[in-house]
Every structure is written in structure tokens, then in C-alpha cells.
Amino acid sequence: MMSRGALAGLLVLGLTACASAKDTAPADPNLSCLLHQPATYIDSLKQLPAAIRAELLKTAGAMADRGEFFNAGDVVEKPAPFNRFIRGGAVGGYWFVWYEHGGIAYWHQIAIFALDPNGRAHVIANQTATQRDLCAATDELLK
């Protein structure tokens, strides 16, 4: 059984961690990087084709647009999504979307979509970015 002192210490430690998580701002991705292949870039969720946007929201869940508030940490400050659009674009017959995910762990996600001849969107790739350079990671997925 844990003593009152040890329990109080754990409580203080936990509250301190929660308070500091709120103050930790996620690192901004490099929005000036360019893919190695010709691409058209977009900076708003609203600029995605409707079918791609619908499939993204079905796959990822609710998402704030770039620059809008989202819950980046595990402390919910107000009702808002845990995902936020970063950047997207078209490369050949594919669309890429970068978004950030908050919560207990913060990460960047890269999703690649394609539209079939009937205009339906399909997820081609959807993975956590393991490197900081989202352009390089996207280039790898598009190979």
C-alpha cells in the first residue's frame, strides 16, 4: 500500500506534467519545402476536392483547418478536434495531405489519396511521419 506522502508526490507530479503539456507548443513543420516532382500546393482543407476531403475526415476524424485552434496536447482546453490540416496538394494523379494530431502523443501524419474514374477517393497511404521533413517523407510515399 502506498503512503500518503508518496501518493501526494505522485499527484503533484501528475498535475505538473498536465500543466506543462498545455504550455508545450508543437514544432511547426517546414511549409516552404518543395516536393521533388511537380506539385500544386494548397493551404486549406477547403481547397481539397470534396471526395478527398470526405475520405480524409472519414479516415482521420474531425479536423481543424490550418491556423485554427485544435487540441494539440492531452489537456482539452475547449471543444475542438485533435487533428489539424497543415498542407496538401496534387502530384500527378494523387493528392497528399499533411495533418498534425494532438493528444497524449503529438505527431504529423501523411495521407495519400487517389480519385478513381467515378470520382471516388481512395486512401493509397496513411502513415505517421517518422522524419521532420514532410516533403522528403511524402516523396518517399509517392515513389
Q: Over which residues does each language-model region extend?
A:
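Short loop/turn segments immediately following beta-strands, especially the blade-tip
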Residues: L115-A121
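Flexible low-complexity loop/turn motifs enriched in small/helix-breaking residues
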Residues: C18-G93, N126-K143
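Bacterial N-terminal signal peptides
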Residues: A8-T16
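Residue-level detector of beta-propeller blades
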Residues: Q109, H122-I124
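Bacterial N-terminal signal peptides that target proteins for export
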Residues: M1-L7
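Exposed beta-strand-loop-beta-strand "reactive/processing" segments of non-cytosolic proteins
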Residues: N83-I112
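Generic "edge-of-domain/loop-turn" microfeature
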Residues: I104, R120, T130-R132
